[in-house]
Amino acid sequence: MNTLQGPVSFKDVAVDFTQEEWQQLDPDEKITYRDVMLENYSHLVSVGYDTTKPNVIIKLEQGEEPWIMGGEFPCQHSPEAWRVDDLIERIQENEDKHSRQAACINSKTLTEEKENTFSQIYMETSLVPSSIIAHNCVSCGKNLESISQLISSDGSYARTKPDECNECGKTYHGEKMCEFNQNGDTYSHNEENILQKISILEKPFEYNECMEALDNEAVFIAHKRAYIGEKPYEWNDSGPDFIQMSNFNAYQRSQMEMKPFECSECGKSFCKKSKFIIHQRAHTGEKPYECNVCGKSFSQKGTLTVHRRSHLEEKPYKCNECGKTFCQKLHLTQHLRTHSGEKPYECSECGKTFCQKTHLTLHQRNHSGERPYPCNECGKSFSRKSALSDHQRTHTGEKLYKCNECGKSYYRKSTLITHQRTHTGEKPYQCSECGKFFSRVSYLTIHYRSHLEEKPYECNECGKTFNLNSAFIRHRKVHTEEKSHECSECGKFSQLYLTDHHTAHLEEKPYECNECGKTFLVNSAFDGHQPLPKGEKSYECNVCGKLFNELSYYTEHYRSHSEEKPYGCSECGKTFSHNSSLFRHQRVHTGEKPYECYECGKFFSQKSYLTIHHRIHSGEKPYECSKCGKVFSRMSNLTVHYRSHSGEKPYECNECGKVFSQKSYLTVHYRTHSGEKPYECNECGKKFHHRSAFNSHQRIHRRGNMNVLDVENL
């Protein structure tokens, strides 16, 4: 067994990728690569390797993509580096006690037990034939012992006229075009294709001027072996038969069947034990790698490495557009697409494009219906792991995301970010048609339809169209709703309040007010009676000074001062500052009245209307005048009444300047200027401005009719 001729360098254990090759790796392979390379470098440092930190290590530590530029020389493209692939795999899978078949000198193959430490594995493995170890560099004249030293000694990398490989088009120095052969037999192109398919990675490369010092035939055959991946062949230093192919057929068969690790849960197979172990953690939930800062656990070491950077304050990558900073260059690259609008990933099903591949993968689950993340509590499944995590907090009650301004907490980070805009006033979404800004992308989407007049939701029953799915669903209830619940006592039908209706027969009033002892049949009537909650009112409107004890009330009130009305009705064009207001308004068009009175069966479009209506049956009048003690069933009636004490008359006529205490009085008065007389007598055709005058006139006809009847009876 030969040992290494010369010191161990980082290039002897490094594997490089071009940008194209790097993009072909899946995320797990990239993480594994990062772990292995960083571990290899740490081993070298631990045994005394002392030199400038390689660029690839710097890139990996900073989270950058470690692929090399076209002009750089890739470490893995020498024959020894290909043998080092086995070395790296054994370091990664150090639990596997048996080493792979080792290269041997003079056509002899040795197989022996390897130790798990890096130094023992490396020193016991002969990487290249002894006959090609000692060479002089043609550029600098140095006498070098190892291929890695020979390759790295020259910085010029001048290229001479090359020969060309007829299989892949790569160019090499030397006259003889060598082939895979044994006893003159040439392997077919089909067999070469099979070798390409069983290769883990395709690694094309070029050699520089320094490689003229080596046997050109050996270099060219080493290039052909790049399509094979594993190195089961014997090394031979006897000239043209540099690689012996006697074991090729057996190796080819073993490679095509080389996925011995099968998952018993899902049946997926793996060629590497390390990947199989990582995959199993997806089923077991095992997360052995814990962050020592926040305690968060991960199933892969590479994922933990990336996570640790989130705790670092250093964010060297800054966006020139918006100033946002990132700790990884990859994150900056992805962020820049939000400004450029670049979306390189397209869905083959619907044509929708995305700026990140992960977003495309998640979107495609909408088409496939795949929901791989089930909740252990309720069995509900989700297409995203983050959605499952958010959902599970609804079972635990945990709210991790807290607003620093008002202290309100949320299950989801995205909900917190949206909420914080109510404090900052940020409106990042702009309409390209009119330039209006919105705080949520959903608001912008709804608004944009007002420009397009798009109404994609059509009712199959009546043909009516809607621009909102929610409005369409509410409208359908008009056609499908039936009174299917019959009271066994009186035969009355009630879809919504059958249980409450039964209590009316039992004369049971389960809802009692703790303040006055009054009882109610239904919870809605009880809620309407209860006094407002007492306590500190910490939210003050800076426009009118009004106080609120809940942020949601304050937010809704504040919009009454602003001109923002992002919610537009697709039917009549009326706009609203709150989505709930639009929701209620649309019932005017759909005819939906979901709130039913359990007493008389009357339906209402709003719950507040039902609550007020209930007071007719209960006789409740919760609003009392502090001046005279008169009580009212509605707050609006109390407000109007109070003006009789204060003398306030806020409604002024634009024509004559006369003022009124009620808006209805102003409306009636305005008819004297417009000449409108909406009330017409069916008897004589006379018209009136006021209903009261019309009613008085009607009495004249009724009295006249009574006199005629009296005369006829005489």
Swiss-Prot record:
Residues annotated as domain KRAB: 8-79
GO CC terms, sorted: nucleoplasm; nucleus
Region (Interaction with AR): 417-714
InterPro entries: KRAB, KRAB_dom_sf, Znf_C2H2_sf, Znf_C2H2_type
Tissue occurrence: Expressed in bone, brain, heart, kidney, liver, lung, pancreas and placenta.
SMART domains attached to this UniProt entry: KRAB, ZnF_C2H2
Positions of the UniProt region annotated as Required for interaction with RB1: 171-260
Localisation: Nucleus
Record bears the keyword Transmembrane helix: no
Residue ranges crossing the lipid bilayer per the database entry: none
Keyword terms, alphabetized: Activator, Isopeptide bond, Metal-binding, Nucleus, Repeat, Repressor, Transcription, Transcription regulation, Ubl conjugation, Zinc, Zinc-finger
Summary of subunit composition and partner proteins: Interacts with AR and RB1. May also interact with other nuclear hormone receptors such as NR3C1/GR.
Family from the record: Belongs to the krueppel C2H2-type zinc-finger protein family.
Entry protein name: RB-associated KRAB zinc finger protein
Source organism of the structure: Homo sapiens (Human)
Organism ancestry: Eukaryota, Metazoa, Chordata, Craniata, Vertebrata
